[in-house]
């Protein structure tokens, strides 16, 4: 090798490593390379070169040159000329296989000196960087998603190739946590917001709870379809950019969810009011419709016509109602399809955030700090569902088009501004995605404890790009991990009852304790979800400080499941009866509960059995004024409430007032107290459950393991959950709203049946989770829940970095070796 060729070859090698000679005095501006008085130790400069060129060239075995070998040396001079080192023998032997081929093993037979000789240029005594390799046929965007190859881009923030130096300070775990948690919170907020407006949606579209349950399961279907494939391909690529793409998709889905309001809003409201009108009854101007501008001929459908022979029914079908019913049904089908597609897309979008973000955090923090980060992540995630309920309570206080309809939020005709939530949440998510796009593939190195210096990076084998043909093998490796499978089954049984409970918790509180919709949402947020967040943070701190064993963590998870199941059984006997409903007959086991007329006068009123408009008189409640035999009404100016008089079935009360009677049931306090204790106890298992999943599989398979669990939870938990619980809720219905012979939403539930079925099925499924947790506990001795982190100087490192120990560890399908 001549001096000229050696000079060119050495400079090309330096530049491929990121070296940028700035002057003639041996001071280099490389990325993390040690400077040693104008001379470089080739063992340090050689390390990144191995990681860049060792993919597919040979069998992966390269002889590292001895530390005494000098890559190049410089002599101070005015012409800034670099002099090649005298002895390149060791280096040439070490790079022999690399110099004879390209990066991917498809060399053209030219050496590096021949390939880049034409790039020599007098730039501060150095050479221009070689052009970007064109062997990879992927686009720039695909390359970005796969992580790229630039050393600078792997540790700095930026967009579209612009990575200013001041942005490097933001490439930290703390900044990523802020953006990631914002996305995580918005996702949880979106789902519980949708749950909080279910009553409004059911009333607007006249659909059953089972239908809304199927609608809610669409989000989980999106996760099932994409979880494992996404985590397999994106888990080894540029995870922040994949997460950002999911956030953009989620934003689009949220915006589309609000489209029905802007397309069909006015028409739906007009149709809904027509279907709620009854054409026969004494006139009452106070019940005119704001939307229809009804005249004084419009009537109150709740009053009694004594001795009347007309067919008085809210489901009477004249021509106008039939046409409106047909039009309303067509619009409802279109709107439900839009909702289904929106929730399906949002499920795909949130899969990227949930399954890629947590492993990304775990990879960038020490194993000792991981429990605390997991606790903060899961704890802050709880703010999303809580905020969703609170935001839903706020939005439903506004009328759907911000007009004054002539009645307040307690009126059955009230339709809240349900569409505000998707617009606001989608906008915030879109803004957060911009920040997520700017994060690098790998954050900067972990902080070292005081007094401990960083060790030089060891040779790292590059990760092989995931291939579709290897996907089944990776899935089989996860399925053969027995601990992961039992932990997955446990997660399904843990989350299925909790998801079902919270989906219909506001409705349960409304029915059981006669709360307003916005009050039920606030209680569900503060007494349930925020308590859960407190328990998660406390458990994370406990694991961080006490460092329990994996078996101890598994035992605690089983214990919390047993406590939760027992608590639900206790709550089955804590509720409020419906004995203050006139004519109520509870179920006796053979026949369902029902409400019958209380006097013969009501039998002659031809009342609409499907029109639930409760009134209160003398401490008793009646389905409607008609069922109480009331024949006249008036409006009380002080509070705009309707007063009914001349009630044949209430001789001792001169008048009755619309709405529920005051609830004298004191069991609400006991319910909230016991429920909060159960929620707190169960939430303390969340961090330990996450750590068991992350530690029971190979480090490279963490994202894939999350994908397996996410798919299983979606397929066997979250998809059937709202359908099962929706059917349970519908089974407790006493009065259905019916229009032209078609059942709509439920107007009144039997409190006893609702309580026993709703909480009973929750207790039973949670007990199955307890049984699965016992199996995990027996096998958990094979898991090291807090392994020594090599980058923190643990004894297990042996001078190697974490990446080396992961890449060198063989991946075998045997469960015992993967744990």
Curated annotation (Swiss-Prot):
Assigned keywords, A-Z: Cell membrane, Disulfide bond, Glycoprotein, Ion transport, Membrane, Transmembrane, Transmembrane helix, Transport
PROSITE patterns tied to this protein: KAZAL_2
Description of the deletion phenotype: Development is arrested at the end of the first instar larval stage. RNAi-mediated knockdown blocks ecdysone-dependent fat body cell migration into the pupal head. In the fat body, results in defective ecdysone signaling.
Ranges facing Extracellular side: 196-213, 264-332, 395-413, 510-522, 575-667, 729-756
Glycosylation sites: 284, 293, 309, 401, 604, 640
GO cellular component, one term: plasma membrane
Comp. bias regions, Polar residues: 24-34, 43-62, 71-81, 807-819
Stretches assigned to the Cytoplasmic side: 1-174, 235-242, 354-373, 435-488, 544-553, 689-707, 778-819
Source species, domain of life: Eukaryota
Chief location bin: membrane
Compartmental location: Cell membrane
Biased composition regions of type Low complexity, renumbered to the chain: 91-111, 144-157
InterPro entries: Kazal_dom, MFS_trans_sf, OATP
Pfam families: Kazal_2, OATP
Membrane topology: Multi-pass membrane protein
Function text: Transporter that mediates the cellular uptake of ecdysteroids, including ecdysone, from the hemolymph.
Entry-linked NCBIfam families: oat
Protein name: Solute carrier organic anion transporter family member 74D
Highest classification ranks of the organism: Eukaryota, Metazoa, Ecdysozoa, Arthropoda, Hexapoda
Gene: Oatp74D
